[in-house]
Amino acid sequence: MKPAVDEMFPEGAGPYVDLDEAGGSTGLLMDLAANEKAVHADFFNDFEDLFDDDDVQ
């Protein structure tokens, strides 16, 4: 027996929207743009060698 949606998410569906309700992918993209989050002003991109595998042994 598979759990029902209300058992998996007791607080409700939240901000997630069915693609049909959002008016297709265009509506979904508009929703994403409207809910865009800003990065904190004190956040610095200080990730030196994130993709550098030369130091991996």
UniProtKB/Swiss-Prot annotation:
Pfam families: MYEOV2. The keyword Transcription regulation does not apply. One of its GO terms (biological process) is cellular response to UV. One of its GO terms (cellular component) is nucleoplasm. The modification Phosphothreonine is found at residue 26. The keyword Cell inner membrane does not apply. Signal peptide: none annotated. It comes from the Eukaryota. Its main location: nucleus. Keywords: Cytoplasm, Nucleus, Phosphoprotein, Signalosome. InterPro entries: CSN9_metazoa. It is found in: Nucleus; Cytoplasm; Nucleus, Nucleoplasm. Belongs to the CSN9 family. Component of the CSN complex, composed of COPS1/GPS1, COPS2, COPS3, COPS4, COPS5, COPS6, COPS7 (COPS7A or COPS7B), COPS8 and COPS9. In the complex, it interacts directly with COPS3, COPS5 and COPS6. The Phe/Asp-rich domain at the C-terminus is necessary for its incorporation into the CSN complex. Component of the COP9 signalosome complex (CSN), a complex involved in various cellular and developmental processes. The CSN complex is an essential regulator of the ubiquitin (Ubl) conjugation pathway by mediating the deneddylation of the cullin subunits of SCF-type E3 ligase complexes, leading to decrease the Ubl ligase activity of SCF-type complexes such as SCF, CSA or DDB2. The complex is also involved in phosphorylation of p53/TP53, c-jun/JUN, IkappaBalpha/NFKBIA, ITPK1 and IRF8/ICSBP, possibly via its association with CK2 and PKD kinases. This is COP9 signalosome complex subunit 9. It comes from Mus musculus (Mouse). The lineage of its organism: Eukaryota, Metazoa, Chordata, Craniata, Vertebrata.
